[in-house]
From Swiss-Prot:
Locations listed in the record: Cell membrane
Record PANTHER family: CONTACTIN 3B-RELATED, PROTEIN SIDEKICK
Fibronectin type-III domain location: 600-698, 703-800, 805-901, 902-998
Domain Ig-like C2-type, first and last residues per copy: 26-117, 122-208, 227-313, 318-402, 408-497, 499-593
Residue numbers spanned by region Disordered: 684-714
Organism: Rattus norvegicus
Name of the molecule in the record: Contactin-3
CDD domains recorded: FN3
Residue stretch(es) of the prosequence: 1003-1028
């Protein structure tokens, strides 16, 4: 169909306007859904939702049962946006099918149908029900007969009084299909009144029917009879896809029948099928095509069985397989628009345009649901809906058809301003303006029309393809596009550059761990192009910031050299230098092999174990690009300090060997093994340890060491040794064999010590002579046998303790804190042992003997000084001898009183006077207090300042004269002497070296004395009138 020029101009304008404003036909966001309104609800309105988007915004109208709803005339209806509000819904007027229409300037769409129903439940008619008489053992069905209602119901039965409901079990069943109560076998306890209770699942309203009395007949008990199926499902039952299907089945009979289910074709039930209410209900959730077929309910008791059969058929409402999609096309084109749905039965199709049935004509046809329109024009634009329906439902799919008419326009898809390519390459210059219908295109280079030739082709989409580009192809290219509505043009500058070349490429390298290298990558490129370098390692782009510790790009603007520092094994692999410009890219690759010490061997296993050997095997780890030349085996036990190298056979394990025998192991010890590989680079990491294994048992081979003994109590022979370490015991059940005999006797006495940790054995016998020599040896044994004995050594039996007390005990005080005790030695025979010494026990007269203190002295001493005593206090003491066998009796007790303490007052006002080499000292007399010892004299202590040896001068006067050499400082102090010891020292006085013929001083002048620097020998002479 040809259009006039006026129509063309108008269509072009409309197409441009539509593009500018982005107009869009209505699209539903919300559609109404089926609703059930409870009659008598407190809510006095119901809302049916409808919302659509579009530009311009849609407006709405509604239909009920195909007739328009005029909200301006009927005030029970109100529109809120697109939502329809029904005020005070009435089941007589408002029940039916509702549809929403959304319209804007581009067209109209219709919503799916939404059914509004009203749920109600009326009361039972008030009439008495006849009583039901049955014999005991007979089955019975009590009918419910629900009142008029709308909406789904649930049923229950009350026994006698509400709310005592009948409990369902294998004997009693309430059908949710019929509402009836089924009792398979009546018992006397069933007698009573039964009331049917009906509940609306929508409104929750509940009504009760009239009671039905159930009584027993008096003509006897019903005998046994085979099952009679009273409740069964239909012979044919359609089931919707995805629904939950419930089949009920119940039988009367005596005994009470057992209900079972099966498929007639013998196929087992899938796991989703559930049996409920004591098998009275078969439930199939999410019903699918494979669940169709014949099902059987079998009721069986001891008198026989009965079977009910029914077939489930499958149906599915239509559902979309392919939805409509918006179409935008040009005038005079053809349209093929397909929507596809599935369902059972197979859906049929019809189409709407702007809410009305599509009118078919010669160029508009529908076939198998697909719409075809030939020679499109703008008036074909609008909103289209495909409806798929079968007897179970219908569905809608909506889309917009835009038929465009416009002149070529490059604004939406402009041509590239510049394209850069290299000499010899292929380039395509695009020319894709928007145009309806599609524009025809031709090209110009400068002012010259481009013609097709061997290297140049005009493409069907309007593009220009140039192969094997040369420098002469560079220039400005213009595409001129034209259709019946107008024409437009666009330009592209083609820039032709020289190709980029790598002039110094990286090469394969072989390095060792820890080295640093540079992989070169230098290029020659067109100066018009910016260049960028990138390195890939094993296909991954190198991040120089993240991996800067190892990788760095070095070189100038035309170089992308890669420096790799401190190379590690992980750096082995393929390196690619990628050079990229705006028009091309080149790359070059090199392999880097990094050699290092080998990785740990793997799968170390102990294949065979004996008492002293272990057969090992392992597999090779990574060789780190350097072949393994040797292996070493290490072992660890609970007794070793870390891992130790062990001996193997072969002694030297070469790099091709994967097995070795470890020798010289200790029996009955738990070992772990590991293997270390070495190559010419060095030793690698050790393998993971093998599993722990224990060597087999063997007889012990090591005897105890340090065998000795002695001591103990009378009539004992004590034998000691160092226990054999656990790792040398060679097996379980380890112990010691102790052998001994008196010196000169040939027969050994043997005994066993079963504890491997026991280092001692004591032999007791009254016949043992004290301190007699024995030959002793200690051997070993375990579960596998006996081992060697230690060398024979001599051990003496226990000594005899002393039996005599020391005699002639005496004690006298030495000072205020010391008492000397003396005694005579006891008579002693060497055959009785060795006398170790004496023990002196002492206590004061205020203490108890049991809490006494003790002092021990060697056996050759006959006196002891007790120190640290309290002053002026009587102490009691006794002495006894002792040896290794024990201690003898104590001597008689003696006592002595410590002297009073020395005076606490030091000699005061010490003054000195030096003449020539003489020094005259004077001091004040010290007077003792009542509780202090009397002063018996004084001691003058003096030494040179450079020596520590102190000289002492005793005197009973308060003065002393010293003859001292010159040229030396002297330190002097004075103490009082008493029977209780020396008193408190005076302050030290320093006498400087004598440099003049006359000098004097006192203790108050000490701080003015300067130290001397020389050292001379001290010659001390003193002249005193001492009385001794």
């Amino acid at each position: 169909m040809m259009l006039s020029w006026k129509q063309l101009i108008l269509l072009s304008f409309i197409g441009c306007l539509a593009g500018e404003l982005l107009l869009q036909g209505p699209v539903f966001v919300k559609e109404p859904s089926n609703s059930i309104f409870p009659v008598g609800s407190e809510d006095k309105k119901i809302t049916l939702n409808c919302e659509a988007r579009g530009n311009p915004s849609p407006h709405y109208r509604w239909q009920l049962n195909g007739s328009d709803i005029d909200t301006s005339l009927d005030h029970r209806y109100k529109l809120n946006g697109g939502n329809l509000i029904v005020i005070n819904p009435n089941r007589n007027w408002d029940t039916g099918s509702y549809q929403c229409f959304a319209t804007n300037s581009l067209g109209t769409i219709v919503s799916r149908e939404a059914k509004l129903q009203f749920a109600y439940l009326e009361n039972f008619k008030s009439r008495m029900r006849s009583r039901v008489s049955v014999r005991e053992g007979q089955g019975v069905v009590l009918l419910c007969g629900p009142p008029p209602h709308s909406g789904e119901l649930s049923y229950a039965w009350v026994f006698n009084e509400y709310p005592s409901f009948v409990e369902e079990d294998s004997r009693r069943f309430v059908s949710q299909e019929t509402g009836h109560l089924y009792i398979a076998k009546v018992e006397p306890s069933d007698v009573g009144n039964y009331t049917c209770v009906v509940t609306s699942t929508v409104t929750n309203a509940r009504v009760l029917g009239s009671p039905t009395p159930l009584v027993l007949r008096s003509d006897g008990v019903m005998g046994e009879y085979e099952p009679k199926i009273e409740l069964q499902f239909p012979e044919t039952l359609p089931a919707a896809k995805g629904s939950t299907v419930k089949l009920e089945c119940f039988a009367l009979g005596n005994p009470v029948p057992q209900i079972n289910w099966r498929r007639s074709d013998g196929m087992p039930f899938p796991t989703k099928i559930k049996l409920r209410k004591f098998n009275g209900v078969l439930e199939i959730p999410n019903f699918q095509q494979e669940d169709t077929g014949s099902y059987e309910c079998i009721a069986e008791n001891s008198r026989g069985k009965n079977v009910a059969r029914g077939r489930l058929t499958y149906y599915a409402k239509p559902y979309w397989v392919q939805l409509l999609k918006d179409v935008e096309t040009a005038v005079e084109d053809s349209l093929y628009w397909e929507c596809r749905a599935s369902g059972k039965p197979k859906p049929s199709y019809r189409w709407l345009k702007n809410g009305d049935a599509l009118v078919l004509e010669e160029r508009i046809q529908i076939e198998n649901g697909a719409l075809t329109i030939a020679n499109l024009n703008v008036s074909d634009s609008g909103m289209f809906q495909c409806i798929a329906e079968n007897k179970h439902g219908l569905i809608y799919s909506s889309a917009e058809l835009k038929v465009l008419a416009s002149a070529p326009d490059f604004s939406r898809n402009p041509m590239k301003k510049m394209i850069q390519v290299q000499v010899g390459s292929l380039v395509i210059l695009d020319c894709k303006p928007s145009a309806s219908p599609r524009a025809l295109s031709f090209w110009k280079k400068g002012d010259t029309v481009v013609r097709e030739q061997a290297r140049i082709s005009l493409l069907n989409d309007g593009g220009l393809k140039i192969m094997n580009v040369t420098k002469a192809d560079a220039g400005i290219y213009t595409c001129i596009a034209e259709n019946q509505f107008g024409k437009a043009n666009g330009t592209t500058q083609l820039v032709v550059t020289e190709p980029t070349r790598i002039i110094l490429a990286p090469s394969n390298m072989d390095v060792a761990v820890g080295e640093s290298i540079i992989l070169p990558c230098q290029v020659q490129h067109d100066p018009l192009l910016d260049i960028m370098f990138a390195w890939y390692f094993n296909g991954t782009l190198t991040d120089f910031k993240k991996d800067g510790s190892h990788f760095e790009k070095v070189g100038g603007s035309s170089s992308g050299d890669l420096m790799i520092r401190n190379i590690q094994l992980k750096h082995s692999g393929k390196y690619v230098c990628m050079v990229q410009t705006g028009v091309d890219s080149v790359s070059s690759a090199a392999e880097l092999i990094v050699r290092g010490s080998p990785g740990p061997p793997e799968n170390v296993k102990v294949d065979e174990i004996t008492d002293t050997t272990a057969q090992l095997s392992w597999t090779e780890g990574t060789d780190s690009h350097s072949p393994v030349i040797s292996y070493a085996v290490q072992a660890r036990t609970p007794f070793s300090v870390g891992w130790q190298n062990v001996r193997t056979v072969p002694e030297a394990i070469d790099g091709k060997t994967r097995t070795a025998t470890v020798v010289e192991l200790n029996p009955w010890v738990e070992y772990e093994f590991r293997v270390v590989a070495s190559n010419k680079i060095g030793g690698g990491e050790p393998s993971l340890p093998s599993e722990k294994v224990r060597t087999e048992e063997a007889a012990p081979e090591v005897a105890p060491s340090e065998v000795s003994g002695g001591g103990g109590s009378r009539s004992e022979l004590v034998i000691t040794w160092d226990p054999v370490p656990e790792e040398l015991q060679n097996g379980g059940g380890f112990g010691y064999v102790v052998a001994f005999r008196p010196l000169g006797v040939t027969t050994w006495i043997q005994t066993v010590v079963t504890s491997p940790d026991n280092p001692r054995y004591v032999f007791r016998n009254e016949s043992i002579v004290p301190f007699s020599p024995y030959e002793v040896k200690v051997g070993v044994y375990n579960n596998k046998g006996e081992g060697p004995f230690s060398p024979v050594t001599t051990v003496f039996s226990a000594e005899e303790e002393p039996t005599v007390a020391p005699s002639h005990i005496s004690a006298h005080s030495l000072s205020s804190s010391e008492i000397e005790v003396s005694w005579n030695t006891i008579p002693w025979k060497s055959s009785n042992g060795r006398l170790l010494g004496y023990e002196v026990r002492y206590w004061n007269n205020g203490g108890e003997e049991e809490s006494s203190s003790k002092v021990k002295v060697a056996g050759n001493q006959t006196s002891a000084v007790l120190r640290g005593l309290k002053s002026n206090l009587a102490y009691y003491t006794a002495v006894r001898a002792y040896n290794t066998a024990g201690a003898g009796p104590f001597s008689a007790t003696v006592n002595a009183t410590t002297k009073k303490t020395p005076p606490s007052q030091p000699p005061g006002n010490v003054v000195w006077n030096a003449t020539d080499t003489k020094v005259l000292l004077n001091w004040e007399q010290v007077k003792a207090l009542e509780n202090e010892s009397e002063v018996t004299g004084y001691k003058v202590f003096y030494r040179t300042s450079s020596q520590n040896n102190v000289q002492v001068l005793n005197t009973n006067k308060t003065s002393a004269e010293l003859l001292l050499p010159i040229k030396e400082d002297y330190i002097i102090e004075v103490k009082a002497t008493t029977d209780g010891g020396d008193g408190t020292s005076s302050e030290q006085i320093r006498i400087p070296r004598i440099t003049s013929m006359d000098a004097r001083g006192s203790t108050s002048a000490i701080s003015d004395i300067h130290p001397v620097s020389g050292y001379i020998s001290v010659l001390l002479f003193f002249i005193v009138n001492a009385l001794w």
